[in-house]
Amino acid sequence: MPASARWQALQEVSILNTGAELPWGGKFSGVAKLIDDAFDAIEKDNEKLKGVLQRISGYAVNEDTLRGLIILFSDTHFTRPTYNGEPVHLGAKDILGHVYEYFLSRFAQAEGKRSGQYFTPKSIVSLIVEMLEPYSGRVYDPAMGSGGFFVQTERFITAHQGNINNVSIYGQEFNPTTWKLAAMNMAIRGIDYDFGKYNADSFTQPQHIDKKMDFIMANPHFNDKEWWNESLADDPRWAYGTPPKGNANFAWLQHMIYHLSPNGKIALLLANGSMSSQTNNEGEIRKAIINADLVECMVALPGQLFTNTKIPACIWFLNRNKKRKGEVLFIDARQIGYMKDRVLRDFTADDIAKIADTLHAWQTSDGYEDQAAFCKSATLEEIKNNDFVLTPGRYVGTAEQEDDGVPFAEKMQNLTALLKEQFAKSAELEAEIKKNLGGLGYE
Protein backbone atom coordinates (compact mmCIF):
# COMPACT_ATOMS: atom_id res chain seq x y z
CA MET A 1 0.00 0.00 0.00
CA PRO A 2 1.50 3.41 -0.97
CA ALA A 3 2.44 5.63 2.01
CA SER A 4 0.05 8.38 0.90
CA ALA A 5 -2.88 5.93 0.99
CA ARG A 6 -2.32 4.53 4.48
CA TRP A 7 -4.82 5.47 7.15
CA GLN A 8 -2.21 6.87 9.51
CA ALA A 9 -1.08 9.28 6.77
CA LEU A 10 -4.66 10.46 6.19
CA GLN A 11 -5.14 10.92 9.91
CA GLU A 12 -1.98 12.99 10.34
CA VAL A 13 -2.26 15.10 7.19
CA SER A 14 -6.02 15.87 7.34
CA ILE A 15 -5.47 18.32 10.23
CA LEU A 16 -2.88 20.40 8.34
CA ASN A 17 -3.57 23.90 7.13
CA THR A 18 -4.12 24.52 3.43
CA GLY A 19 -0.77 24.98 1.67
CA ALA A 20 1.24 22.92 4.17
CA GLU A 21 3.94 20.63 2.77
CA LEU A 22 2.97 16.96 2.40
CA PRO A 23 5.42 14.26 3.61
CA TRP A 24 5.46 12.66 0.12
CA GLY A 25 5.77 15.95 -1.76
CA GLY A 26 3.37 18.64 -2.90
CA LYS A 27 1.08 20.84 -0.84
CA PHE A 28 -2.07 20.08 1.14
CA SER A 29 -5.16 21.50 -0.59
CA GLY A 30 -8.01 19.89 1.33
CA VAL A 31 -9.30 16.61 2.80
CA ALA A 32 -11.38 15.65 -0.25
CA LYS A 33 -8.34 15.98 -2.53
CA LEU A 34 -6.26 14.04 0.02
CA ILE A 35 -8.74 11.13 -0.01
CA ASP A 36 -9.10 11.17 -3.80
CA ASP A 37 -5.31 11.08 -4.20
CA ALA A 38 -5.24 8.09 -1.82
CA PHE A 39 -7.83 6.33 -4.00
CA ASP A 40 -5.72 7.08 -7.08
CA ALA A 41 -2.69 5.53 -5.40
CA ILE A 42 -4.64 2.43 -4.32
CA GLU A 43 -6.03 1.86 -7.82
CA LYS A 44 -2.61 2.37 -9.37
CA ASP A 45 -1.21 -0.25 -7.01
CA ASN A 46 -4.14 -2.68 -7.49
CA GLU A 47 -5.29 -3.15 -11.08
CA LYS A 48 -8.53 -4.93 -10.06
CA LEU A 49 -9.75 -1.85 -8.20
CA LYS A 50 -9.18 0.49 -11.14
CA GLY A 51 -12.31 2.62 -11.58
CA VAL A 52 -14.01 1.04 -8.55
CA LEU A 53 -13.45 3.66 -5.83
CA GLN A 54 -15.81 6.63 -6.07
CA ARG A 55 -14.08 10.02 -5.75
CA ILE A 56 -15.14 12.19 -2.80
CA SER A 57 -14.69 15.56 -4.49
CA GLY A 58 -17.65 14.90 -6.77
CA TYR A 59 -20.06 14.93 -3.80
CA ALA A 60 -19.10 18.37 -2.40
CA VAL A 61 -18.89 17.08 1.19
CA ASN A 62 -17.98 19.70 3.78
CA GLU A 63 -14.28 19.58 4.78
CA ASP A 64 -15.10 19.59 8.50
CA THR A 65 -17.43 16.63 7.98
CA LEU A 66 -14.66 14.66 6.26
CA ARG A 67 -12.20 15.51 9.04
CA GLY A 68 -14.77 14.41 11.60
CA LEU A 69 -15.24 11.06 9.84
CA ILE A 70 -11.49 10.45 9.78
CA ILE A 71 -11.27 11.25 13.50
CA LEU A 72 -14.27 9.02 14.26
CA PHE A 73 -12.80 6.03 12.42
CA SER A 74 -9.38 6.69 13.94
CA ASP A 75 -10.87 6.51 17.43
CA THR A 76 -12.51 3.15 16.65
CA HIS A 77 -10.52 0.17 17.93
CA PHE A 78 -10.15 -1.99 14.84
CA THR A 79 -6.98 -3.66 16.15
CA ARG A 80 -8.22 -4.24 19.73
CA PRO A 81 -12.02 -4.15 19.47
CA THR A 82 -14.27 -4.52 22.49
CA TYR A 83 -17.99 -5.13 22.95
CA ASN A 84 -19.67 -4.33 26.29
CA GLY A 85 -16.21 -3.98 27.78
CA GLU A 86 -15.07 -7.44 26.66
CA PRO A 87 -12.40 -8.04 23.98
CA VAL A 88 -13.62 -9.29 20.59
CA HIS A 89 -11.19 -11.76 19.04
CA LEU A 90 -11.37 -10.59 15.44
CA GLY A 91 -8.68 -9.15 13.23
CA ALA A 92 -8.90 -5.65 11.75
CA LYS A 93 -9.82 -7.14 8.35
CA ASP A 94 -12.75 -9.05 9.87
CA ILE A 95 -13.97 -5.99 11.78
CA LEU A 96 -13.88 -3.85 8.64
CA GLY A 97 -15.75 -6.58 6.79
CA HIS A 98 -18.48 -6.63 9.43
CA VAL A 99 -18.73 -2.83 9.31
CA TYR A 100 -19.10 -2.92 5.52
CA GLU A 101 -21.73 -5.66 5.76
CA TYR A 102 -23.60 -3.70 8.43
CA PHE A 103 -23.83 -0.62 6.23
CA LEU A 104 -24.99 -2.72 3.27
CA SER A 105 -27.78 -4.22 5.37
CA ARG A 106 -28.84 -0.80 6.68
CA PHE A 107 -28.83 0.63 3.16
CA ALA A 108 -30.95 -2.35 2.07
CA GLN A 109 -33.53 -1.61 4.78
CA ALA A 110 -33.61 2.06 3.78
CA GLU A 111 -33.85 1.30 0.07
CA GLY A 112 -36.63 -1.28 0.47
CA LYS A 113 -37.66 -2.68 -2.92
CA ARG A 114 -34.67 -1.14 -4.67
CA SER A 115 -32.20 -3.07 -2.49
CA GLY A 116 -32.79 -6.43 -4.16
CA GLN A 117 -30.21 -5.76 -6.84
CA TYR A 118 -27.33 -5.88 -4.38
CA PHE A 119 -28.36 -7.45 -1.07
CA THR A 120 -29.53 -10.93 -0.05
CA PRO A 121 -30.47 -11.33 3.65
CA LYS A 122 -27.61 -12.86 5.62
CA SER A 123 -29.68 -15.73 7.02
CA ILE A 124 -30.60 -16.94 3.51
CA VAL A 125 -27.00 -16.63 2.34
CA SER A 126 -25.83 -18.59 5.40
CA LEU A 127 -28.45 -21.29 4.81
CA ILE A 128 -27.46 -21.82 1.18
CA VAL A 129 -23.72 -21.94 1.93
CA GLU A 130 -24.26 -24.37 4.83
CA MET A 131 -26.30 -26.65 2.58
CA LEU A 132 -23.87 -26.56 -0.37
CA GLU A 133 -20.64 -26.83 1.71
CA PRO A 134 -18.21 -25.15 -0.74
CA TYR A 135 -14.91 -26.36 0.76
CA SER A 136 -12.90 -26.17 -2.47
CA GLY A 137 -13.27 -25.55 -6.19
CA ARG A 138 -14.74 -22.79 -8.34
CA VAL A 139 -17.52 -20.73 -6.74
CA TYR A 140 -19.71 -18.69 -9.10
CA ASP A 141 -22.57 -16.20 -8.77
CA PRO A 142 -23.94 -14.85 -12.09
CA ALA A 143 -26.11 -12.26 -10.29
CA MET A 144 -23.69 -11.49 -7.49
CA GLY A 145 -24.98 -8.16 -6.15
CA SER A 146 -22.50 -7.02 -3.50
CA GLY A 147 -20.91 -10.48 -3.23
CA GLY A 148 -22.63 -11.82 -0.11
CA PHE A 149 -22.34 -15.48 -1.16
CA PHE A 150 -18.57 -15.11 -1.58
CA VAL A 151 -18.16 -13.52 1.86
CA GLN A 152 -20.17 -16.31 3.48
CA THR A 153 -18.13 -18.91 1.61
CA GLU A 154 -14.98 -17.47 3.17
CA ARG A 155 -16.59 -17.58 6.62
CA PHE A 156 -17.73 -21.17 6.09
CA ILE A 157 -14.24 -22.28 5.06
CA THR A 158 -12.63 -20.45 8.00
CA ALA A 159 -15.14 -21.94 10.46
CA HIS A 160 -14.23 -25.43 9.23
CA GLN A 161 -10.47 -24.79 9.41
CA GLY A 162 -10.18 -24.78 5.64
CA ASN A 163 -8.10 -22.65 3.29
CA ILE A 164 -9.74 -19.85 1.30
CA ASN A 165 -7.06 -20.35 -1.34
CA ASN A 166 -8.71 -23.69 -2.16
CA VAL A 167 -11.61 -21.85 -3.81
CA SER A 168 -11.63 -19.57 -6.84
CA ILE A 169 -14.25 -16.81 -6.86
CA TYR A 170 -16.09 -15.91 -10.07
CA GLY A 171 -18.94 -13.45 -10.38
CA GLN A 172 -20.87 -11.21 -12.71
CA GLU A 173 -23.11 -8.20 -12.16
CA PHE A 174 -25.04 -5.97 -14.56
CA ASN A 175 -25.34 -2.83 -12.39
CA PRO A 176 -22.09 -0.79 -12.45
CA THR A 177 -22.45 0.58 -8.91
CA THR A 178 -23.25 -2.84 -7.49
CA TRP A 179 -20.30 -4.36 -9.39
CA LYS A 180 -18.06 -1.83 -7.59
CA LEU A 181 -19.65 -2.63 -4.22
CA ALA A 182 -18.78 -6.31 -4.74
CA ALA A 183 -15.19 -5.52 -5.71
CA MET A 184 -14.73 -3.37 -2.60
CA ASN A 185 -16.33 -6.10 -0.48
CA MET A 186 -13.70 -8.57 -1.68
CA ALA A 187 -10.82 -6.08 -1.34
CA ILE A 188 -11.68 -5.29 2.29
CA ARG A 189 -11.48 -8.99 3.13
CA GLY A 190 -8.44 -9.78 1.00
CA ILE A 191 -10.38 -12.25 -1.18
CA ASP A 192 -9.05 -12.77 -4.70
CA TYR A 193 -11.73 -12.73 -7.40
CA ASP A 194 -12.60 -12.61 -11.08
CA PHE A 195 -15.67 -10.48 -11.79
CA GLY A 196 -14.91 -10.03 -15.46
CA LYS A 197 -13.42 -6.92 -17.01
CA TYR A 198 -16.53 -4.83 -16.41
CA ASN A 199 -20.16 -4.97 -15.31
CA ALA A 200 -22.22 -6.89 -17.87
CA ASP A 201 -25.42 -8.87 -18.47
CA SER A 202 -24.91 -12.58 -17.73
CA PHE A 203 -27.18 -13.60 -20.61
CA THR A 204 -25.95 -11.38 -23.46
CA GLN A 205 -22.37 -10.71 -22.29
CA PRO A 206 -21.28 -13.70 -20.19
CA GLN A 207 -17.84 -13.01 -18.72
CA HIS A 208 -17.00 -16.64 -17.89
CA ILE A 209 -18.57 -18.45 -20.84
CA ASP A 210 -15.99 -21.26 -21.04
CA LYS A 211 -15.71 -21.90 -17.29
CA LYS A 212 -17.29 -24.88 -15.54
CA MET A 213 -18.09 -24.23 -11.89
CA ASP A 214 -18.26 -26.48 -8.83
CA PHE A 215 -20.62 -24.37 -6.71
CA ILE A 216 -23.09 -21.91 -8.21
CA MET A 217 -25.23 -19.72 -5.95
CA ALA A 218 -27.50 -16.87 -7.00
CA ASN A 219 -30.39 -14.65 -6.01
CA PRO A 220 -31.44 -13.00 -9.29
CA HIS A 221 -34.35 -10.61 -9.70
CA PHE A 222 -37.55 -12.69 -9.41
CA ASN A 223 -39.72 -13.06 -12.52
CA ASP A 224 -37.62 -10.60 -14.53
CA LYS A 225 -39.70 -9.51 -17.54
CA GLU A 226 -37.03 -7.48 -19.34
CA TRP A 227 -34.21 -9.95 -19.87
CA TRP A 228 -34.74 -11.21 -23.41
CA ASN A 229 -32.62 -10.32 -26.44
CA GLU A 230 -33.15 -11.77 -29.91
CA SER A 231 -29.50 -12.86 -29.98
CA LEU A 232 -30.47 -15.48 -27.35
CA ALA A 233 -32.97 -17.30 -29.59
CA ASP A 234 -30.75 -20.32 -30.38
CA ASP A 235 -28.43 -20.08 -27.39
CA PRO A 236 -26.75 -23.40 -26.46
CA ARG A 237 -27.59 -22.77 -22.80
CA TRP A 238 -31.26 -23.60 -23.44
CA ALA A 239 -30.66 -27.36 -23.49
CA TYR A 240 -33.96 -28.07 -21.71
CA GLY A 241 -36.11 -25.63 -23.67
CA THR A 242 -36.18 -21.96 -24.62
CA PRO A 243 -37.28 -19.84 -21.63
CA PRO A 244 -40.25 -17.49 -22.06
CA LYS A 245 -39.34 -13.99 -23.17
CA GLY A 246 -41.40 -12.48 -20.35
CA ASN A 247 -39.82 -14.35 -17.42
CA ALA A 248 -36.13 -15.06 -16.74
CA ASN A 249 -36.57 -17.70 -14.00
CA PHE A 250 -35.74 -20.69 -16.20
CA ALA A 251 -33.13 -18.71 -18.11
CA TRP A 252 -31.18 -18.30 -14.86
CA LEU A 253 -31.62 -21.96 -14.00
CA GLN A 254 -30.36 -23.14 -17.39
CA HIS A 255 -27.52 -20.60 -17.46
CA MET A 256 -26.31 -22.09 -14.19
CA ILE A 257 -26.73 -25.69 -15.36
CA TYR A 258 -24.69 -24.84 -18.48
CA HIS A 259 -21.78 -23.74 -16.26
CA LEU A 260 -22.01 -26.75 -13.94
CA SER A 261 -18.95 -29.02 -13.65
CA PRO A 262 -19.37 -32.85 -13.68
CA ASN A 263 -19.63 -32.85 -9.87
CA GLY A 264 -21.08 -29.36 -9.55
CA LYS A 265 -23.92 -28.15 -7.33
CA ILE A 266 -26.41 -25.29 -7.68
CA ALA A 267 -28.48 -23.27 -5.20
CA LEU A 268 -30.86 -20.82 -6.85
CA LEU A 269 -33.42 -18.56 -5.18
CA LEU A 270 -36.54 -18.20 -7.30
CA ALA A 271 -40.17 -17.17 -6.90
CA ASN A 272 -42.49 -19.99 -5.81
CA GLY A 273 -44.20 -19.93 -9.19
CA SER A 274 -41.16 -21.61 -10.72
CA MET A 275 -42.11 -24.84 -8.92
CA SER A 276 -45.53 -25.19 -10.51
CA SER A 277 -45.94 -22.86 -13.51
CA GLN A 278 -47.22 -24.53 -16.68
CA THR A 279 -47.29 -21.42 -18.89
CA ASN A 280 -45.03 -20.40 -21.78
CA ASN A 281 -43.00 -23.63 -21.87
CA GLU A 282 -41.98 -23.38 -18.19
CA GLY A 283 -43.71 -26.64 -17.29
CA GLU A 284 -41.91 -28.48 -20.11
CA ILE A 285 -38.52 -27.05 -19.10
CA ARG A 286 -39.07 -28.06 -15.47
CA LYS A 287 -40.16 -31.55 -16.59
CA ALA A 288 -37.01 -31.96 -18.71
CA ILE A 289 -34.74 -30.87 -15.85
CA ILE A 290 -36.50 -33.26 -13.45
CA ASN A 291 -36.25 -36.15 -15.92
CA ALA A 292 -32.52 -35.43 -16.27
CA ASP A 293 -32.34 -36.19 -12.51
CA LEU A 294 -30.59 -32.90 -11.73
CA VAL A 295 -32.93 -31.71 -8.96
CA GLU A 296 -31.69 -32.82 -5.54
CA CYS A 297 -33.68 -30.74 -3.06
CA MET A 298 -36.45 -28.13 -3.00
CA VAL A 299 -36.90 -25.78 -0.04
CA ALA A 300 -40.01 -23.63 0.44
CA LEU A 301 -39.11 -20.50 2.43
CA PRO A 302 -41.31 -18.51 4.83
CA GLY A 303 -42.57 -15.10 3.81
CA GLN A 304 -41.13 -11.73 4.87
CA LEU A 305 -37.47 -12.75 4.60
CA PHE A 306 -36.65 -10.11 1.99
CA THR A 307 -36.58 -6.33 2.30
CA ASN A 308 -37.31 -5.82 -1.40
CA THR A 309 -40.17 -8.19 -2.21
CA LYS A 310 -43.15 -9.97 -0.68
CA ILE A 311 -43.16 -12.62 -3.43
CA PRO A 312 -43.00 -16.10 -1.80
CA ALA A 313 -39.64 -17.72 -2.56
CA CYS A 314 -38.01 -21.12 -2.73
CA ILE A 315 -34.53 -22.55 -3.21
CA TRP A 316 -33.70 -24.98 -6.00
CA PHE A 317 -30.78 -27.30 -5.21
CA LEU A 318 -29.37 -29.14 -8.21
CA ASN A 319 -26.53 -31.65 -8.30
CA ARG A 320 -24.85 -32.98 -11.42
CA ASN A 321 -23.66 -36.08 -9.53
CA LYS A 322 -26.12 -36.65 -6.69
CA LYS A 323 -25.83 -39.84 -4.65
CA ARG A 324 -29.53 -40.63 -4.37
CA LYS A 325 -30.45 -41.11 -8.01
CA GLY A 326 -34.12 -40.91 -8.89
CA GLU A 327 -35.07 -39.13 -5.66
CA VAL A 328 -35.71 -35.55 -4.56
CA LEU A 329 -35.81 -34.20 -1.01
CA PHE A 330 -38.62 -31.75 -0.26
CA ILE A 331 -38.31 -29.40 2.73
CA ASP A 332 -41.17 -27.14 3.79
CA ALA A 333 -39.55 -24.41 5.90
CA ARG A 334 -42.47 -21.97 5.74
CA GLN A 335 -43.12 -22.23 9.49
CA ILE A 336 -39.47 -21.82 10.51
CA GLY A 337 -37.88 -18.59 11.74
CA TYR A 338 -38.93 -15.67 13.92
CA MET A 339 -40.08 -12.07 13.39
CA LYS A 340 -37.08 -9.81 14.09
CA ASP A 341 -39.32 -6.74 13.76
CA ARG A 342 -42.80 -5.85 12.47
CA VAL A 343 -42.00 -6.57 8.82
CA LEU A 344 -38.99 -8.89 8.57
CA ARG A 345 -38.53 -12.55 9.42
CA ASP A 346 -35.14 -14.14 10.11
CA PHE A 347 -33.58 -17.54 10.79
CA THR A 348 -31.69 -18.43 13.96
CA ALA A 349 -28.51 -20.50 13.82
CA ASP A 350 -30.58 -23.48 14.99
CA ASP A 351 -33.10 -22.94 12.18
CA ILE A 352 -30.30 -22.96 9.60
CA ALA A 353 -28.74 -26.06 11.16
CA LYS A 354 -32.09 -27.90 11.17
CA ILE A 355 -32.63 -27.36 7.43
CA ALA A 356 -29.01 -27.97 6.40
CA ASP A 357 -28.63 -31.05 8.61
CA THR A 358 -31.80 -32.52 7.11
CA LEU A 359 -30.31 -32.33 3.61
CA HIS A 360 -26.95 -33.73 4.72
CA ALA A 361 -28.57 -36.61 6.61
CA TRP A 362 -30.68 -37.43 3.55
CA GLN A 363 -27.65 -37.31 1.25
CA THR A 364 -25.75 -39.81 3.40
CA SER A 365 -28.82 -41.82 4.53
CA ASP A 366 -27.48 -41.29 8.06
CA GLY A 367 -30.40 -40.95 10.45
CA TYR A 368 -32.77 -39.33 7.96
CA GLU A 369 -36.52 -39.88 8.37
CA ASP A 370 -39.47 -38.22 6.66
CA GLN A 371 -41.25 -35.76 8.97
CA ALA A 372 -44.86 -34.86 8.30
CA ALA A 373 -45.27 -31.16 7.40
CA PHE A 374 -41.48 -30.66 7.17
CA CYS A 375 -39.56 -33.04 4.92
CA LYS A 376 -40.19 -35.90 2.51
CA SER A 377 -38.02 -37.95 0.16
CA ALA A 378 -39.96 -38.51 -3.07
CA THR A 379 -39.18 -40.61 -6.12
CA LEU A 380 -39.25 -39.28 -9.67
CA GLU A 381 -42.31 -41.48 -10.22
CA GLU A 382 -44.16 -39.68 -7.41
CA ILE A 383 -43.17 -36.34 -8.92
CA LYS A 384 -44.39 -37.51 -12.32
CA ASN A 385 -47.73 -38.46 -10.74
CA ASN A 386 -47.94 -34.89 -9.43
CA ASP A 387 -47.53 -33.42 -12.93
CA PHE A 388 -43.88 -32.53 -12.25
CA VAL A 389 -44.87 -29.89 -9.70
CA LEU A 390 -42.09 -29.33 -7.15
CA THR A 391 -43.96 -27.50 -4.39
CA PRO A 392 -42.82 -29.11 -1.08
CA GLY A 393 -46.24 -28.73 0.55
CA ARG A 394 -47.67 -31.17 -1.98
CA TYR A 395 -45.32 -33.93 -0.76
CA VAL A 396 -44.61 -33.36 2.94
CA GLY A 397 -48.29 -33.39 3.96
CA THR A 398 -49.57 -31.92 7.22
CA ALA A 399 -48.59 -32.58 10.81
CA GLU A 400 -50.69 -35.06 12.74
CA GLN A 401 -53.10 -33.35 15.11
CA GLU A 402 -52.82 -34.51 18.71
CA ASP A 403 -56.02 -36.24 19.85
CA ASP A 404 -57.51 -34.25 22.74
CA GLY A 405 -59.98 -37.02 23.59
CA VAL A 406 -63.10 -34.96 22.78
CA PRO A 407 -65.51 -36.89 20.49
CA PHE A 408 -66.16 -35.34 17.07
CA ALA A 409 -69.92 -35.02 17.67
CA GLU A 410 -69.30 -33.07 20.87
CA LYS A 411 -66.83 -30.74 19.09
CA MET A 412 -69.36 -30.02 16.34
CA GLN A 413 -72.10 -29.31 18.90
CA ASN A 414 -69.86 -26.82 20.75
CA LEU A 415 -68.75 -25.12 17.52
CA THR A 416 -72.34 -24.84 16.27
CA ALA A 417 -73.43 -23.26 19.55
CA LEU A 418 -70.54 -20.77 19.36
CA LEU A 419 -71.44 -19.89 15.76
CA LYS A 420 -75.08 -19.21 16.76
CA GLU A 421 -73.87 -16.87 19.50
CA GLN A 422 -71.74 -14.97 17.02
CA PHE A 423 -74.62 -14.70 14.53
CA ALA A 424 -76.83 -13.28 17.29
CA LYS A 425 -74.17 -10.78 18.32
CA SER A 426 -73.73 -9.74 14.69
CA ALA A 427 -77.47 -9.12 14.31
CA GLU A 428 -77.48 -7.11 17.54
CA LEU A 429 -74.61 -4.90 16.35
CA GLU A 430 -76.24 -4.42 12.93
CA ALA A 431 -79.46 -3.23 14.58
CA GLU A 432 -77.51 -0.81 16.81
CA ILE A 433 -75.68 0.67 13.82
CA LYS A 434 -78.96 1.16 11.90
CA LYS A 435 -80.47 2.87 14.95
CA ASN A 436 -77.54 5.28 15.24
CA LEU A 437 -77.67 6.07 11.52
CA GLY A 438 -81.40 6.77 11.82
CA GLY A 439 -80.72 9.21 14.64
CA LEU A 440 -78.42 11.10 12.29
CA GLY A 441 -81.06 11.22 9.59
CA TYR A 442 -79.65 8.41 7.45
CA GLU A 443 -82.33 5.76 7.16
Swiss-Prot record:
InterPro entries according to UniProt: DNA_methylase_A-5, SAM-dependent_MTases_sf, T1MK-like_N_sf, Type-I_RE_MTase_Subunit
Keyword Disulfide bond applies: no
One biological process term in Gene Ontology: DNA restriction-modification system
EC number(s) from the headed UniProt entry: 2.1.1.72
Oligomeric form and interacting partners: The type I restriction/modification system is composed of three polypeptides R, M and S; the restriction enzyme has stoichiometry R(2)M(2)S(1) while the methyltransferase is M(2)S(1).
Family membership noted in the UniProt record: Belongs to the N(4)/N(6)-methyltransferase family.
Annotated PANTHER family: TYPE I RESTRICTION ENZYME HINDI METHYLASE SUBUNIT (PTHR42998:SF1), TYPE I RESTRICTION ENZYME HINDVIIP M PROTEIN-RELATED (PTHR42998)
Protein name stated in the entry: Type I restriction enzyme HindI methylase subunit
